[in-house]
């Protein structure tokens, strides 16, 4: 699992690749960065911003809403890319507890477990609870491997709709947790489905256009690399219901690296994993755990902190690596 941030920190480097298919090389280079341990999100006036986790974060006022994004913890993973995913999750929570500003709550954008085992969910809960934060979850495909998705739904899905979608409000911001791993399409593309789209349209239709919106789901709601299933086939319809809002932020995981894109009033951001990195889009035959030198692993894992401030359009997002 990882924490996500929208900003570029001093310890981040650009990841380059030369493939022209899927997304244009220039566009990916413009929006893609490797980050470290986490993302600190600040929403101020509806706008996400990128902050240095120990510097600018300390300057945030009490009028800001700050929350944490975790993603892709893959508890139970023990392959060469990271033989101790539980240990790096623990390191991430230590980072969270050392933040200069305590987040109001956390969101987890899926793949809590690696194999949907009850014991893996138990271990994840034990570690994440050490943050002493309320956590709002959405599932990844690795959380839905057991018959009827019972272990995830019994633990995290109470009070949700359908396969686990829901919404809530905090400090004037409307948060929407969506599920796009229930019925994966060809190549592993995410899918929201007609029932969830109908629910979304109804969920937001009575909101003022000035309401800041934060959507979070596991698979990106923008097409990053369709050959690897890094996108959601019906995301465009979902986003059409959000066009009238002045500030929309979409937070995802799944690809285990930080990428960001801004389209009009919508900011898209993907978070790091706390378990293992994956290749840059098109760099290799397929996605999956990527083995890197041991001294580099923790620079590719991390957390994200997000802050919202009144009268600002975009959220401030801070990515912090487990190791600088």
Q: What do these predicted ranges mean?
A:
Residues 78-79, 112, 181-192, 222-227:
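Surface-exposed cleft-lining segments at the edges of enzyme active sites
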Residues 16-43:
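N-terminal secretory signal peptides and thylakoid transit peptides that target proteins
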Residues 1-24, 51:
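N-terminal secretory signal peptides
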Residues 117-212, 234-249, 261-272, 276, ...:
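Extended active-site neighborhood of metal-dependent phosphoesterases/phosphodiesterases
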Residues 70-71, 106-110, 136-141, 216-217, ...:
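Active-site neighborhood of phospho(di)ester-bond hydrolases with catalytic His/Asp-centered motifs
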Residues 208-224:
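Short acidic, glycine-rich surface-loop motifs adjacent to enzyme active sites
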Residues 41, 50-122, 202:
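N-terminal active-site segment of His-dependent metallophosphoesterases
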Residues 317-324:
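Short, solvent-exposed aromatic-acidic interface loops
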